[in-house]
Amino acid sequence: MKLGDLAVGHLYSLQAALIDLGQDPKPLFERYGVTPELLAHPQARISIPRFMRLGHAAIRESDTPAIGLLMGQQVQISHFGLAGMAAQCASSLLDAFATLVRYERLTSQNYRGHSSLAPPALQFYSISPYNNFNLFVVDSALAARAQLGQQLTAGQARLREVHIEFPAPAYAEEYENCFQCPVLFGQSANQLLWDPASLELPLVQSAPATYAQLMQLCERELEQLDRHRHIRERVEEIVSPELHRRLPTLSEVAEQLGLPTWTLRRRLHTEANTRFQDIVNETRRDLAITYIRDTDLALGEIAFLLGFSSQGAFQRGFRKWTGQPPGAFRRQYRQTLAAENTDERLGHS
């Protein structure tokens, strides 16, 4: 199971931030398989683990821990694809944000959740536990949305506060320079709290007819995306973010899918030859393997994310699934990957 992926438009702001810092992004991008051809492809996506590693490498090589804030300040509405172009034509800032939230899946898929809008709050989902690899993701997401608010209203929109889940990092003073409002750390959510009047501001490029046309295109793209997702994938999407909390029941998942419980049970059997509890167990197993293989999260952090009572319980479960302790599995995978990369470089030399 994948942790998710992003449209390559999300890399444009990282590219611009590095250039603004006097860095050439091309060698770094190519090291992570991000070529000019990939950046120009309309359907291209990059996995979230690769995005994390690329961002962390950019921080290290530019010596700029606050690079996520710089990324957000470099964002353009066009980076959000068709949904961004539709949002630009909305009648108000509130409608623009609602458009971006509704069609977020066109440019971003993350099993941890999706952004939400509950005026005056525009919220980015939690990606805790936090570490040096993922702070920049929250920074860039919130800074980008703040920047869009300014762009779409010709600088008139105002933030009241910014709330961030993780504790203040070493570069905390950079936040108020970026957001121009109080920034509170250690909060219950990652969110921008807008001045309510700002959300009613008209957009500088509002165009009702064009907005309606682009909304139809976005809706068509979303329907096509859903049409190609099997019932199992839709259940996994609901179950996955809840693994570290109380797991949803079959009836609760059915309600979210707009199906009677018996219909969901029947469709899982006939279309996927599986049961609801099997999906829960297999989702936990697949995510455990993905976290060990593709991230640098500590074992205790992975245990928390997957709802295990302790690190020891996670290690026992992982050994049962794979026949190896998680640490040994990770080391073996990394060694194999390093050997393959060495062979590939030798083959091109």
Each predicted region: which residue ranges?
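Extended mid-to-C-terminal alpha-helical interaction segments
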Residues: 169-170, 174-349
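Short hinge/gating elements
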Residues: 81-87, 127-131, 199-200, 220-222
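Hydrophobic alpha-helical core bundles mediating ligand binding, dimerization, or RNAP-core interactions
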Residues: 55, 97, 142-145, 218, ...
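Short, contiguous, pocket-lining structural segments
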Residues: 6, 20, 133, 137, ...
